[in-house]
């Protein structure tokens, strides 16, 4: 086990001392993008039918590209401000979010319904249930990763109160664990069982196993989701967590929430957050929403497989379905993945010169 020195091994002061991870789209570029979305929006048109070349991003795409690069290959997160919001309906803003995803990579399905874009919005689900998911609940979430190289969140409406985004570097947490509790770091390099929250595809088991930390080709990969580990304990055949495993989990969460390590932010309407899911752990506080449906908290979430991805550890193959670089990978295939989904994956991967799993 080694300490990793990298831009992604940041602490709070590192983020506060520089703004190289923060990007702004100016008003003129935002207006151009708004007009492009409005001209292309059709309530009855399937999102899969849009091509990246249809959208006019102007010079704003260079800004978004830099933000993607920062999140993917440097600090592990970035924020873009200035997406057009005021003159777009919720559905038009959804199309804008989708358009960004089309240019940035191949979107991946996110759940039981095999949905390729999700509204991060409270629909009354129970986060702690065996099939619970955080994005459809207003509960406070555990620190976790998503099942894709990158997560993009775009903010249309913020909550009445709460809903604060929390991000901690998994790389930094790894380093702290080695320094302070090397005995627990050794446990973190061993496999833990995670539940698929009853969203497994027909060819998948209800659980998968992964270490919390693993090294491949000189890169550190981080994985964590307490809620899924706890859910897995109720699934037949999953071994009971050992005392040391429980202590490792608790110590990891304690590190992640240290004030000097946990970065917090509120996403404002028109903000976009980009997170690297094998470097960063993210969470969110609980929130109180508005009664008015038009004002309710709404963020759009995309899971992306980018064309410049790197090789993953061998053990991640069950988790991502492929570990090879520049391969379409990740996502929760779910139970509604059909020919329409497969055709989108095939067509869009070809557009981006990416490879796709064929078996």
Segments the model singles out, each with a brief description of its role:
Residues 1-61, 65-66, 72-73, 78, ...:
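Active-site environment of non-heme Fe oxygenases that use a 2-His-1-carboxylate facial triad
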Residues 97-107:
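A short alpha->loop->secondary-structure connector
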Residues 91-98, 167-169:
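"Short basic amphipathic alpha-helical interaction patches in structured regions
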């Amino acid at each position: 086990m080694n300490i990793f020195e990298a831009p992604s091994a940041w602490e709070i002061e590192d983020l506060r001392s520089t703004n190289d991870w923060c990007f702004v789209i100016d008003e003129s570029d935002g207006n151009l993008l708004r007009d492009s979305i409005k001209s292309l929006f059709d309530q009855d048109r399937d999102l899969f039918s849009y091509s990246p070349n249809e959208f006019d991003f102007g010079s704003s795409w260079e800004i978004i590209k830099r933000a993607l690069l920062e999140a993917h290959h440097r600090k592990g997160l970035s924020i873009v401000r200035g997406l057009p919001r005021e003159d777009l309906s919720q559905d038009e803003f959804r199309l804008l979010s989708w358009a960004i995803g089309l240019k940035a990579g191949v979107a991946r399905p996110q759940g039981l319904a095999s949905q390729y874009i999700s509204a991060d919005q409270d629909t009354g689900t129970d986060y702690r249930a065996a099939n619970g998911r955080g994005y459809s609940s207003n509960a406070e979430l555990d620190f976790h990763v998503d099942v894709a190289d990158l997560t993009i969140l775009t903010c249309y409406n913020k909550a009445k109160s709460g809903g604060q985004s929390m991000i901690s570097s998994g790389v930094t947490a790894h380093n702290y664990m080695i320094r302070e509790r090397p005995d627990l770091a050794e446990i973190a390099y061993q496999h833990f069982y995670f539940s698929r929250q009853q969203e497994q595809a027909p060819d998948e088991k209800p659980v998968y196993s992964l270490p919390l930390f693993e090294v491949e080709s000189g890169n550190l990969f981080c994985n964590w989701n307490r809620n899924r580990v706890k859910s897995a304990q109720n699934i037949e055949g999953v071994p009971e967590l050992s005392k040391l495993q429980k202590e490792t989990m608790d110590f990891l969460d304690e590190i992640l929430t240290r004030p000097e390590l946990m970065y917090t932010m509120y996403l404002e309407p028109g903000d976009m957050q980009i997170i690297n899911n094998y470097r960063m752990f993210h969470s969110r506080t609980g929130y109180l929403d508005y009664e008015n449906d038009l004002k309710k908290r709404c963020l759009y979430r995309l899971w992306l497989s980018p064309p410049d991805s790197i090789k993953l550890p061998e053990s991640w193959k069950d988790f991502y379905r492929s570990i090879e670089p520049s391969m379409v990978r990740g996502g929760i295939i779910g139970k509604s993945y059909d020919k329409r989904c497969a055709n989108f994956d095939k067509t869009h991967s070809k557009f981006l010169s990416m490879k796709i799993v064929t078996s």
